[in-house]
Amino acid sequence: MCLLQLPVVLLLLSAALNTLKATPIASDTDHRVDKRKCNTATCATQRLTNFLVRSSHNLGAALPPTKVGSNTYGRRNAEVVDVELLHYLPL
């Protein structure tokens, strides 16, 4: 008799859980910082690189791209720029 009641109890429990609504968490109490979606060209380039690496798995080893920040692309070496500017300054 106990084995026959188990499916009935599970069915009722499932129906009760399906009718419950989740309560939203108040954003005032949440102190975590949400990650913002980046819309700059650098981030778009990184997302495109990730997509191409994952989609071209049949061409060779699918190595994940290195994670570089937005300051890496087009970054200049400050020492070289300063030295070049010093040659043009009149003394």
Curated annotation (Swiss-Prot):
PROSITE patterns the UniProt entry points to: CALCITONIN (PS00258)
Matches recorded under SMART domains: CALCITONIN
One Gene Ontology term, aspect cellular component: extracellular space
Chain residues in the propeptide: 23-34, 77-91
Record-listed Tyrosine amide modification sites: Y73
Xref: PANTHER family: CALCITONIN-RELATED (PTHR10505), ISLET AMYLOID POLYPEPTIDE (PTHR10505:SF4)
Pfam families cross-referenced by the UniProt entry: Calc_CGRP_IAPP
Signal peptide range: 1-22
Protein name per UniProt: Islet amyloid polypeptide
Keyword set, alphabetical order: Amidation, Amyloid, Cleavage on pair of basic residues, Disulfide bond, Hormone, Secreted, Signal
Any GO molecular function: hormone activity
Domain note: The mature protein is largely unstructured in the absence of a cognate ligand.
Keyword Disulfide bond in record: yes
Main location: secreted
Superkingdom, taxonomy of origin: Eukaryota
InterPro entries: Calcitonin-like, Calcitonin/adrenomedullin, Calcitonin_CS, Calcitonin_peptide-like, IAPP
Assembly and interaction partners: Can form homodimers. Interacts with IDE and INS. Interaction with INS inhibits homodimerization and fibril formation.
Disulfide bonding pattern of the chain: C38-C43
Cellular compartment(s): Secreted
